[in-house]
Each structure stands twice: as C-alpha cells, then as structure tokens.
C-alpha cells in the first residue's frame, strides 16, 4: 500500500465567514471542535505514515478552535519533521493563543481575496477594517521562522485587485503572494455554472499570464492519473470521516478513523474504485466534476 505523505486535517468546522466559493453550509454536520482526546487518537492512527506536509484546515476557521495551540503542539510532537501549514481568515484579534501557535506552524496563509469592496463581497461578513487591524496587531508577533504568505483566490471579479493586495503584502513584510484560480468544491456543479469562475475575459487572462504568471499555483500538465490524493494523501473532517480530497467535500465518506484504521479504509472497495479510476484515466462519478481538471485550460493559457 502506498504511504501517506500529505495530510489535510480538519479540527473544527466553526467559521465566522460565509465565503462565496465555499460550500461549507452544504456539507458540514453539527458544529464541532475536535476534542484533544480525539485529536490524539487520530494522530495515533496515522503516525506510522511518513507525512511530510500537512494542512490543519477544512470547512472551518482553524484559529476558532479554543485549543488550537495545543492542536498544533500535539501534531508537531507526533510529526516533528513535517511541514505544518495553516490558513486563517484574519477576522479576529491576535491573542496569546495565536502567538503560541506560531511556535509550531511552518507556513501560515493569510486568506485575502480582493481589495476593500470585493474582499467584503466575496468573504462576507468579513470587514476590511478588521483585516487591517489584524495586520497591525501581527506586526508585534514573533514569527519563529514561520513563512507567512498571502493566499488569494482569483475570480473574474477581483483580478484588478491583485496588485493592491501585493502592495499590502509588501507593506506588512509577508513573504509571498500565492494566486489560486477559484474552484467549485461541489461534485454536482461545474466551473461553467458560475460566471465568476468561468467568465474571464481574454484581457484578464493575458494580464494574469504576463504580470502574475509566477505567482499562480498549480500545474497545467495534469490528468487524473497524476492525482496524488488517491495515492499518497488523506483528507479528514472534524468527525473523523475520511474523504478522498478537498476538491469534493460533499462526497460521502469512505469510512471513519474512529471506527476503522486508515489502512483498512484505504483498502475498502469504494476507495479502491475511485483510486483505480484515476490511475487509469477513467474517473468514476466521484471525480466527474473535478474542479482541478476543469482548471487545466485556464492554467495552460496563463502558462503555469
């Protein structure tokens, strides 16, 4: 069996925002913070895998977990050599818990999609003033060598704001601007169903290619048999459910880590069918609207 080297682990599904490209309200169950006891059990269940990179995020704002500093500490205690990545929406005040988290996080994404009006539109009910306050507070935070970057989800309505956010990044001594072309995380919908994810003009695409090509994440040379999720990754929800990837958060889980081992779940028939479908470039219905596959023409155009 292939070893897991990448983990995407959700420890809370609480969130203070309702972002336009997030299907959170359609897929989450009851609001929940994972207990430290369950978190310890989950880590024990996957610690035999050589995980090299992990993201502690999902359908919630990670920093809303009341013990997220302990969550991070426990993870790094279990996987001391693993690169730990966390994304945050910056819509809260920096506190001691946040400062403690910085000791364990290797890369921190500040999610900033758009400038002022477009930011508040796409990340409602986020407030621009609250973001600026957070950035001001962050200036006094010890980063402990954490690489702090800006993660920007690009859509057809915020392309013109990229330069403004890059200026904001520089003003706040953040190391990188990461541009992610917006995706749809729903297996029943396509990028073509939303003008914001498909309605780019040629001028916009040329601008992205010529000005920001080096900042755009992803790769255009990709087919289903290149999918690393089915071979070397794990995606878990706050309940312990195992799903295939973060591109299809609405899918039925293959199993639960608190009921079966991760190795047992990965051997189950439904899991293996999805895996074999990708490996043979004959995807099952699970992957029929893979938003990453749908992105390929755009990524090719912008030269990624």
At which residue positions do the language-model features occur?
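Conserved SAM/AdoMet-binding glycine-rich loop
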Residues: 14-17, 24-27, 36-114
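Short loop/turn hinge sites at secondary-structure boundaries
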Residues: 2, 280-281
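Short donor-sugar binding/catalytic loops of nucleotide-sugar-dependent glycosyltransferases
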Residues: 60, 153, 293
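Membrane-proximal basic amphipathic "stem/tether" segments
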Residues: 1-2, 290-304
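N-terminal pre-triad scaffold of radical SAM enzymes
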Residues: 1-21, 51-57, 231-240
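Radical SAM enzyme [4Fe-4S]-AdoMet core and its adjacent flexible, acidic
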Residues: 10, 29-34, 44, 69, ...
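Local cysteine-cluster metal-coordination motifs and their immediate loop/turn environment
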Residues: 16-24, 244-247, 284-294
């Amino acid at each position: 069996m292939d070893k897991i080297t990448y983990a995407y682990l959700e420890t809370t599904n609480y969130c203070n925002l309702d972002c336009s490209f997030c299907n959170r309200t359609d897929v989450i169950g009851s609001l929940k913070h994972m207990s430290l006891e369950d978190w310890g059990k989950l880590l024990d269940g996957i610690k035999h895998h050589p995980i090299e990179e992990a993201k502690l995020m999902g359908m919630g704002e990670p920093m809303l977990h009341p013990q997220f500093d302990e969550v991070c500490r426990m993870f790094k205690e279990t996987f001391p050599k693993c690169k730990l990545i966390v994304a945050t929406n910056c819509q809260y005040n920096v506190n001691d818990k946040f400062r403690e988290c910085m000791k364990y996080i290797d890369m921190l994404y500040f999610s900033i999609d758009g400038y002022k009006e477009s930011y508040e539109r796409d990340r409602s009910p986020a407030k621009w003033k609250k973001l600026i306050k957070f950035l001001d507070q962050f200036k006094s935070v010890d980063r402990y060598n954490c690489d702090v970057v800006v993660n920007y989800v690009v859509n057809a309505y915020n392309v013109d704001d990229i330069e403004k956010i890059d200026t904001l990044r520089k003003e706040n001594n953040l190391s990188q601007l990461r541009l992610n072309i917006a995706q749809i995380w729903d297996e029943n919908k396509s990028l073509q169903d939303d003008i914001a994810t498909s309605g780019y003009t040629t001028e916009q695409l040329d601008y992205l290619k010529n000005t920001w090509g080096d900042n755009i994440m992803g790769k255009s040379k990709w087919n289903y048999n290149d999918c690393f999720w089915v071979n070397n990754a794990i995606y878990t929800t706050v309940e312990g459910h195992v799903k295939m990837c973060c591109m299809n958060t609405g899918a039925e889980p293959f199993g639960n880590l608190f009921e079966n081992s991760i190795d047992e779940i990965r051997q189950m028939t439904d899991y293996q069918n999805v895996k074999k479908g990708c490996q043979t470039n004959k995807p099952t219905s699970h992957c029929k609207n893979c938003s990453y596959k749908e992105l390929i023409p755009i990524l090719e155009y912008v030269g990624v």
